[in-house]
Amino acid sequence: MLSYCEYLAIKKMNPDDDCYIETIVYDIPECNDVICQWNGFELDRIFHLNTPNVKSVIAPQKWEQLMAEIRSSQFWLKNWNYPVYFTQAFQHIGIPLKNIRGDFERTGESDKTTLSVPRYKKTFLFQYLNYLRKRYLSRQSTDIPQFPDLFVQTEDSIFTGQQLTFKYMGTGIERIEPEVRKAFIFPELTSSRDKELAKKVSECQSVAIHARRGDMLSFNFDCYYGGYFKRAVKYIRQMVSNPKFFIFCDPGSVEWAKHHAHVFGLDFKHDNIEFVDWNKGDDSWRDMQLMSLCKHQIITRSSFGWWSAWLNTNPEKITCSPTHYFLTTHHF
């Protein structure tokens, strides 16, 4: 979804030019071993966007050549350096593109802060000390990092890659907000269970808590062991009368959440709480839809959760995140 927003930004700046998306990583199974691709590219299936994919304008034989070269590069083992190897492969099938995304092997940059976490970084002590260091630095500075301008106007044929930064403050998503909201209109709910939940969240001061662990646990360590959820829940209690908490988890985290009430600053015996854990597989995206229908959100460092908060149309919403430059109303 963030990538599609970048497409909209490029198209806005170059309205008369042909602009395409590419979904190559979803067709390479090995990529999923490094960065989870979940159910692959789903925007056309869910939102019926009919996005212009560059694959549609390349002859099948040329596309096979392109994919063979990209797979042989094993970019996913080279700091996810797809911009370099993708543009090289496009060049070799006669499509020269200027790489404006960069060279991750040269700069050490990547699309994720950590693609492969060394064993010593997985220890509780290391992660906790690292969290304390980051929290101290965060409290010392409220500066918003400078992110690349996503509204690029050019006469060159370019490969932009993915910045995935529209979820951050100062990146300009408001410039394409009408187009984004028009694109991401969820289909009507179909299951009786989802419909029942939608009715519940509309009739109370509903608070969605996105307790995503799974593949994002190393990035959200501080949320669970640094008191983030407790601070966010405490603030919600101060500002919202009779809140009801709806906890959304990935399938493998539900039981963990049910046995760790203290992590969330909740009392499962006395607080009004409901777990949402039935949307799985091809229906996983329904959780985003249901979370967006809640009055308020408490999210982690996850674009899935962030979209639920951003798409929430409640004018008095409170949206909480653990990073001071996330585009939410509050940070803890």
Report residues per predicted region:
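Donor-binding and catalytic core of enzymes assembling or modifying cell-surface/extracellular glycoconjugates
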Residues: 1, 240-327
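N-terminal pre-catalytic "stem/leader" segment of glycosyltransferase-like enzymes
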Residues: 1-30
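Residues within alpha-helical segments
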Residues: 4, 8, 195, 309-310
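A general structural detector for well-ordered alpha-helical segments in enzyme core domains, enriched
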Residues: 6, 229-232, 260
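Structural alpha-beta junctions
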Residues: 9-18, 46-54, 233-243, 264-274, ...
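Short, solvent-exposed loop/turn segments at secondary-structure junctions
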Residues: 25-29, 164-166, 171, 212-216, ...
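Short, aromatic/basic amphipathic alpha-helical patches
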Residues: 31-49, 253-267, 332
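Secretory-pathway luminal glycosyltransferase catalytic domains
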Residues: 33-240
